[in-house]
């Protein structure tokens, strides 16, 4: 269906408050493209429109104006809804809200069962998906006994079992501790690299965003920045003016530069910082 997995054209979305009879503009004429196989992060603080944008990517919300295309399918066409949701799976913030069965493998099988997949193929899909997220040995466990990071990996396995082309993750690490966050990020990157599945990650964690192929920054319902992580985070002043932070090492480089140290602000990780400091005379 072409090289774009997701494409929005002049997208507008308004939340209507029926009690107060007023509208809130959540997305204001946003156009964006996400390539097949890309790992894109959408960054923004609360109320920026990033989660609303995510919900348009698997037709949980439909545009008030403009268009959203998923793998070439217009989400406004009611006949496309189920196919859109099959091609673009979604993982949410709270893992407990996404798990529906009392045994891990039954939970992962839930999606393909509802698609009417043959039982033998369901078995293969469940095993393959659990292996892909490193949770195969937990297949007979009860999901409620797992850690937050493990639960999110089960949620990702459940989406993988439906054989999507794209996974949209709406702040999947927001409720996790640092080790759980690392587990989930490792899984997301492996799914993207090994299987070529397009990943759209909504986050407010800068260290997660730094690992993406490309970043889109949203503010007040508009797309305000777009580029590779190095390009985005080197604009420290602009990022801070939007109310966001930059990765800690980038912040350190920025502060050193302000003090007259000859160092680039295009530093994203500790190894790069060590190399840059070692080269100073």
Curated annotation (Swiss-Prot):
Belongs to the ABC transporter superfamily. Energy-coupling factor EcfA family. Signal peptide: none annotated. It is an enzyme of class 7 (translocase). SUPFAM superfamilies: P-loop containing nucleoside triphosphate hydrolases. ATP binds at residues 44-51. It comes from Clostridium perfringens (strain SM101 / Type A). It is found in: Cell membrane. Transmembrane segments: none annotated. Its EC number is 7.-.-.-. One of its GO terms (molecular function) is ATP hydrolysis activity. InterPro entries: AAA+_ATPase, ABC_transporter-like_ATP-bd, ABC_transporter-like_CS, ABC_transpr_CbiO/EcfA_su, ECF_ABC_transporter_ATP-bd, EcfA_1, P-loop_NTPase. Forms a stable energy-coupling factor (ECF) transporter complex composed of 2 membrane-embedded substrate-binding proteins (S component), 2 ATP-binding proteins (A component) and 2 transmembrane proteins (T component). GO terms for cellular component: ATP-binding cassette (ABC) transporter complex. Gene3D superfamilies: P-loop containing nucleotide triphosphate hydrolases. It comes from the Bacteria. It is a peripheral membrane protein. Residues 6-245 form the ABC transporter domain. Keywords: ATP-binding, Cell membrane, Membrane, Nucleotide-binding, Translocase, Transport. This is Energy-coupling factor transporter ATP-binding protein EcfA1. ATP-binding (A) component of a common energy-coupling factor (ECF) ABC-transporter complex. Unlike classic ABC transporters this ECF transporter provides the energy necessary to transport a number of different substrates. The keyword Transport applies.
């Amino acid at each position: 269906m072409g090289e774009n997995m997701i494409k929005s054209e002049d997208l507008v979305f308004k939340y209507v408050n029926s009690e107060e009879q007023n509208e809130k503009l959540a997305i204001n004429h946003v156009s964006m493209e996400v390539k097949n196989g890309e790992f894109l992060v959408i960054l923004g603080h609360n109320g920026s429109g990033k989660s609303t944008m995510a919900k348009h990517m698997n037709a949980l919300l439909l545009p008030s104006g403009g268009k959203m295309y998923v793998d070439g399918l217009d989400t406004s066409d009611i006949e496309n809804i189920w196919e859109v949701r099959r091609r673009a799976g979604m993982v949410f913030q709270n893992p407990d809200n996404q798990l529906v069965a009392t045994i891990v493998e039954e939970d992962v099988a839930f999606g393909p069962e509802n698609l009417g997949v043959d039982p033998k193929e369901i078995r293969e899909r469940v095993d393959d998906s659990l292996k892909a997220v490193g949770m195969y040995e937990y297949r007979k466990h009860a999901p409620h006994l797992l850690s937050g990071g493990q639960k999110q990996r089960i949620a990702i396995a459940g989406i993988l079992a439906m054989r999507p082309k794209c996974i949209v993750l709406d702040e999947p690490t927001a409720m996790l501790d640092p080790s759980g966050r690392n587990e989930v990020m490792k899984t997301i990157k492996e799914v993207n690299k090994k299987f070529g599945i397009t990943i759209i990650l909504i986050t407010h964690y800068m260290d997660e965003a730094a690992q993406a192929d490309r970043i889109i920054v949203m503010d007040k319902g508009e797309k305000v920045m777009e580029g590779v992580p190095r390009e985005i985070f080197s604009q420290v002043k602009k990022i801070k003016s939007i109310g966001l932070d930059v990765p800690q090492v980038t912040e350190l480089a920025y502060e050193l530069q302000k003090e007259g140290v000859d160092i680039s602000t295009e530093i994203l990780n500790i190894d790069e910082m060590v190399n840059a400091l070692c080269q100073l005379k």
